[in-house]
C-alpha cells in the first residue's frame, strides 16, 4: 500500500501575495513539517493562469490577477519543493482532472492506502481536489490536515472543513 500527500497551491500569491492572508502565512511551517515527515508519494498542484486571466470566467468572478505563469506569485514557496515529490501539476482551474487521472494510474500500479490533502485555499482548491480524489477513488480514505490549510477567510475555512466532513473526508488536526 502506498500513501499520497497532495500539496495544493502553496504558491506565493496565495501565501503573502495578491491573495495572501495572515492565516496562509501561518501554515507554512506546518506544511513544511508535514512534507518533510511524509514517507509516501508527494504531488503538488500549482494554480496556473495566463496574461488573459481578467478575460476568463474566473477573472470576471475574482478580479484579482494571480498565479500568472512564470511570475514570482505563481511559484511554489521556496523550501517546499525538493522533498521527493513525484509531480507538480499545473491546473488552470480549482480542481485538477490531471490529478484524478494520476491517482488512478498510481492506484493501478500499487493500491493506495490513503490520500491526504494540505494547502490553499481550503474553501476553493483544497475542497475541489479532495472531492475530486473521492470521486476518482471512492474506496480510498481521503483526509485533510486542517493545521496545514487556510481559507480565504477563517469562516470559509471552517465551512469548507464542515462540507468535506459531510462528504466523508476526514479532517485531522482541527
Regions found by a protein language model. Give the residues of each.
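Active-site acidic carboxylates
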Residues: 1-88, 109, 152, 158, ...
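Histidine-anchored nucleotide/phosphate-binding helix
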Residues: 30-35, 127-137
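A short helix->loop->beta-strand "cap" motif at the edges of active sites that frequently abuts
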Residues: 38-40, 137-141
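Active-site beta-loop-alpha junctions enriched in small/polar residues
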Residues: 47, 94, 147-149
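Internal catalytic-core helix/loop-beta-alpha segment
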Residues: 70-124
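Short, charged, surface-exposed secondary-structure boundary motifs
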Residues: 98-100, 152-155
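A short glycine-rich beta-strand->turn/loop micro-motif centered on a GG-aromatic cluster
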Residues: 116-120, 141-154, 174
